Curated annotation (Swiss-Prot):
Family according to the record: Belongs to the MgpC family.
Protein name: Putative MgpC-like protein MPN_464
Annotated spans, Disordered: 23-44
Transmembrane spans: none
Biased composition (Low complexity): 31-43
Amino acid sequence: MAAVTDNQQSGDNNGLVSLAQRSTTVAVQKSDSSGSQGQGTTDNKFQKYLNTTQALHQMGVIVPSLETWPGKPSTGIATRAAGGVSVQAATRQSTSTNEDLSNVITQLYHTSTSQLAYLNGQIVVMGSDRVPSLWYWVVDERTTSGRATWWAHTELNWGTDKQKQFVENQLGFKDDSNSDSKNSNLKAQGLTQPAYLIAGLDVVADHLVFAAFKAGAVGYDMTTDSNASTKDQVLAWSTTAGLDSDGGYKALVENTAGLNGPINGLFILLDTFAYVTPVSGMKGGSKNTEAVQTKYPVKDDSKASAKIASLINASPLNSYGDDGVTVFDALGLNFNFKLDEARLPSRTDQLLVYGIVNESELKSARENAQSTSDDNSNTKVKWTNTASHYLPVPYYYSANFPEAGNRRRAEQRNGVITIKKAIYPEVRGRQLQNIFDDWKTNKSR
């Protein structure tokens, strides 16, 4: 799909603006920095998970000690004004152990520990008043219990038990015998959504959109059919081959495969896009055989019925195939870099920009995904098992991206990243329609 260029946004202060870091590949090995010591070997073989603080450090996030965390940044580097966040990036100091907010990722991380957005009776919160949190949750005001409808752990340091619990939460497993029990109903246990580190958030045309660091990718079944076998269950997307099998799950829990699966001795940290997707006029049903009803932008007279359906990751996910490394694209379909390079970004770039997917493409995607005959395969989304329809929102990088050969992160270029405040939905909707029209024009060329 055609990308929206920086030139299309220049001069428009109300345009869609977001932070999106490209994926960064780093070797997990012994390091002199205090945030990642002892988590690998000198031959770059993966040994075990980084704990959360160490993983954040690898991504450039400096986490202060909990004892001195004041709840809000006190350095004045990042400020929150009029619903938006504006931060000045600084060069990353990978060996720094002080508590300065040293780069744009750290600044966004710390400024996000407060209410982020309000949408259709749902309050999206990241962190708490006292300690920084890696995860987020959503509280629906319409529930009498006041309990968060989406939930994930908020711990900064995990032991083995927490790692296992995280895997079960992310992938829909809840089992101690290593048997395949992927149909566990985790909603009853409060474990219904994957974890993301939010790097930016906005409300766009009555839709909640955020850029985030991927910690897992899971779809949530929103079918209203009480007889559906998948009702209220988490739908797992695997980032490791054979994760639906006993061996794949056991290997991941025992930390032998790596968080996303090792490729050529490298550990992949995917710090890139993620989306909350809108659904308008969604039809339920256990087999979801009716026509796809998702549309974007949502019309003004139907915005009240728009629903946040599920999460989608628009980043290459590591898996294994007969012809090399395979990935999921934004529709959850299985592509191969060697066989379909024109559809995918390069391995060295991995900065993904997706256009708006129309209904016919979604329908085709569902039909394609249904063509898989292997029930244990997790290389394609099984659309017959979910009433969720995935629709990527065009949410893209706003800074001037350097030429090939000089691809560095924004904070390494002393760039400025600004997250714009939400504006009136009808105004933003017109802007998105213009983007959509430009995308269609470019695609037809």
